[in-house]
């Protein structure tokens, strides 16, 4: 059975891993998943990530906790295969009034809503993290 929405699967694995207080979660790797993991690391939501394996690459995301509490309060998919959500540069959403981030896929790569606004670019809203 093929996976219908790999990004929703990634978000679910991270959410479930944090609820179960896991140190890290593993998933099949792809360029988009690695780019999303890089944004999460850059914003301080995960400790680290690594790709291993040649034939079937596996992405391992090391989760982050602060004083025993999970760092990611919520992670949700916005644009999905059945309903893509695109926003122009001045329509990009602010998650929790700027406390969270929206992950945006632009023509220059995957970045946060703040970076996209600064670059003057819009794109597909992949998801929200807070």
Curated annotation (Swiss-Prot):
Alphabetically sorted, this entry's keywords are: Ribonucleoprotein, Ribosomal protein, RNA-binding, rRNA-binding
Q: Domain of life of the organism in this record?
A: Bacteria
Task: Report the InterPro entries cross-referenced here.
Answer: Ribosomal_uS8, Ribosomal_uS8_CS, Ribosomal_uS8_sf
Indicate whether Cell cycle appears among the record's keywords: no
One Pfam family assigned to this protein is: Ribosomal_S8
GO CC terms, sorted: ribonucleoprotein complex; ribosome
One GO MF annotation is:
rRNA binding
GO biological process per UniProt: translation
User: Matching Gene3D superfamilies, A to Z?
Assistant: 3.30.1370.30, 3.30.1490.10
Self-association or partners: how does it assemble?
A: Part of the 30S ribosomal subunit. Contacts proteins S5 and S12.
Enumerate the HAMAP family for this protein. Answer: Ribosomal_uS8_B
Free-text function comment from the UniProt entry:
One of the primary rRNA binding proteins, it binds directly to 16S rRNA central domain where it helps coordinate assembly of the platform of the 30S subunit.
Q: Which family does it belong to?
A: Belongs to the universal ribosomal protein uS8 family.
Q: What is this protein called?
A: Small ribosomal subunit protein uS8
Organism of this sequence = Pseudoalteromonas atlantica (strain T6c / ATCC BAA-1087)
Task: Tell me the classification of the organism that encodes this protein.
Answer: Bacteria, Pseudomonadati, Pseudomonadota, Gammaproteobacteria, Alteromonadales
